[in-house]
């Protein structure tokens, strides 16, 4: 039993929290902005738990969808489903249970939030299949990873104002930036199996594309800060995030696999910088 639970934990990447953090930071930015400061703590924990559950469900669905491809990729061939340690139906069952628990969390919230939760689940569940035909699936990932933004505004304000969609667009650019660096790690394997990724699509302009996406992300988040009238700590946070992006350039410019992966992981700190600036800006108002 314990061995089975360990395999399920690996399936949903409990040992690799970076994905949850990249999903969580935009949600937290939005919660603070929507509430004008710290949100109600009950709502805060609903969104934190929902983020963890939906990211875990997404990992299970992703492994199920990619099970015939992952065996040809060095980094993924030892995943529990790919290695034959669990069955395909088990991965689907785990994903379904996690998604249902996540949806149960939003049942006490307003109708708009519940409808957006359904949309978010559809986007998360269909993302793995976009890698079959969409040249930049990372953009779709950005929608999936950023959907906590409109949901946060909906839960707190019972509306989704334009600034929320602006932030969602910013998150799309951020996701393309960090996940292109991630895709650079697997590019050779993805070319062999015919998988679509932004790293392949951008080709020799991959590094330039990543930096342009960071610039677009920062510009759109700056616009959001202006619309919300945020004070100087927010701008310090954005400046620190820009510094993180500059550091990522030093890691990815030589296209070394391990350094590209390090750049991907370091985006946790970029998201944290934006959150810290946001939280302090509201705290001193």
From Swiss-Prot:
EC id: 2.5.1.39
Membrane-crossing residue ranges in chain numbering: 28-48, 86-106, 110-130, 133-153, 165-185, 210-230, 232-252, 262-284
GO MF entries: 4-hydroxybenzoate polyprenyltransferase activity
Residues in the signal sequence: none
Reaction catalysis annotation: all-trans-octaprenyl diphosphate + 4-hydroxybenzoate = 4-hydroxy-3-(all-trans-octaprenyl)benzoate + diphosphate
Keywords of this entry: Cell inner membrane, Cell membrane, Magnesium, Membrane, Transferase, Transmembrane, Transmembrane helix, Ubiquinone biosynthesis
Subcellular location per the Swiss-Prot or TrEMBL entry: Cell inner membrane
Gene3D superfamilies the record matches: UbiA prenyltransferase
Pathway terms, separated by semicolons: Cofactor biosynthesis; ubiquinone biosynthesis
Topology in the lipid bilayer: Multi-pass membrane protein
Annotated GO CC locations: plasma membrane
Biological processes per GO annotation: ubiquinone biosynthetic process
Claim: Transmembrane helix is one of the keywords in the record: yes
Superkingdom to which the source organism belongs: Bacteria
Similarity comment: Belongs to the UbiA prenyltransferase family.
NCBIfam families: ubiA_proteo
Name by which UniProt lists this protein: 4-hydroxybenzoate octaprenyltransferase
């Amino acid at each position: 039993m314990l061995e089975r639970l360990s395999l399920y934990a690996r399936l949903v990447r409990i040992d690799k929290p970076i994905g949850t953090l990249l999903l969580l930071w935009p949600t937290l930015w939005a919660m603070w902005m929507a509430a004008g400061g710290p949100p109600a703590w009950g709502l805060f924990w609903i969104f934190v738990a929902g983020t963890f559950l939906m990211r875990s469900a997404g990992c299970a669905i992703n492994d199920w969808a990619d099970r015939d491809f992952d065996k040809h990729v060095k980094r993924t061939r030892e995943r529990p489903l790919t290695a034959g340690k669990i069955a395909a139906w088990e991965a689907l069952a785990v994903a379904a249970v996690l998604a249902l628990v996540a949806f149960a969390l939003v049942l006490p919230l307003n109708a708009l939030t519940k409808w957006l939760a359904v949309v978010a689940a559809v986007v998360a569940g269909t993302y793995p299949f976009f890698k079959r035909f969409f040249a930049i699936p990372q953009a779709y990932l950005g929608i999936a990873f950023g959907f906590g933004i409109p949901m946060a505004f909906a839960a707190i304000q019972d509306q989704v104002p334009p600034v929320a969609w602006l932030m969602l667009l910013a998150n799309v650019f951020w996701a393309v930036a960090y996940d292109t660096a991630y895709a650079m790690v697997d590019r050779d394997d993805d070319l062999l199996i015919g998988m679509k990724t932004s790293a392949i699509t951008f080709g020799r302009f991959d590094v330039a594309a990543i930096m342009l996406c960071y610039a677009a992300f920062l510009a759109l988040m700056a616009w959001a800060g202006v619309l919300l009238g945020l004070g100087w700590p927010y701008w310090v946070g954005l400046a620190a995030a820009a510094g993180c992006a500059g550091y990522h350039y030093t890691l990815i410019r030589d296209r070394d696999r391990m350094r590209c992966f390090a750049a991907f992981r370091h985006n946790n700190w970029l998201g944290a910088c934006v959150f810290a600036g946001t939280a302090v800006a509201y705290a001193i108002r």
